[in-house]
Amino acid sequence: MTRCLVVGKPNVGKTLFSLRFAFFLGAEAIRLARAGQEREWASVDEAVRELVSDRPHQTLELQRLVLDIRGRKGSRRFELVDTGGLTDDIPASPEVRQAQVDTLGLLFQSKFLLHMLDASAVGRPGAPEAPGEVDVQLYHFGRARGRYLLLANKMDLEGALEGWREARRRFPGVPMVAVSAVTGQGFKEVRRHLQRHL
């Protein structure tokens, strides 16, 4: 099955995006596989309440959603994988380090990469969510291999538009979509991009 990996720093909105995008694609219930077990929530809101947090490193295991995306050639099934946040430094926690190892291990095994930034933090150097060296490395990796889309998330927050412009300047030559995991902004563009490349 084709795999699409959602990567980025902690607290940029990867889990919320993954859950809401699954709903946008027509998933009525959220069925998620993680740590070798499958779990189901009756609604995306239930899953969001349990899985999304303002705390960094809430996602410590790869979370796999099997979804269908409709295109001109019919419907295609793919796996959307929500990952633990990657950091510029080595985390003290062994659980967080393992989550990062798991994420990096899937980079080369995934057909498509969705790299998420917090657009509202782009212009705030020193903010934990601000783009850092790990984002630069993901950008270069994605640009070199193709099948890569940069997502500037949190466009519903103050400062995000300026952050979007700055991200376009810092990360040139790759497709970028302004999204909001909260409002659904940009989901149609992401879907179109995936339809073309999956």
Role assignments for model-derived ranges:
Residues 156-198:
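Canonical P-loop GTPase G-domain recognition
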Residues 13, 87-88, 123, 158-159, ...:
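Catalytic P-loop NTPase motifs of RecA-like helicase/translocase cores
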Residues 58, 93-96, 130-131:
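A conditional alpha-helix N-cap/helix-loop micro-motif detector
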Residues 58-61, 76-79, 99, 160-163, ...:
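Helical mechanochemical/support elements of P-loop NTPase systems and associated helical scaffolds
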Residues 1-88:
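Conserved G1/Walker A P-loop phosphate-binding module
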Residues 12, 16, 95-98, 184-185, ...:
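Charged, alpha-helix-enriched surfaces in structured cytosolic catalytic cores
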Residues 30, 92, 119:
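Short, conserved catalytic or interaction motifs in soluble domains
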Residues 99-174:
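Conserved C-terminal guanine-recognition region of P-loop GTPase G domains, centered on the G4
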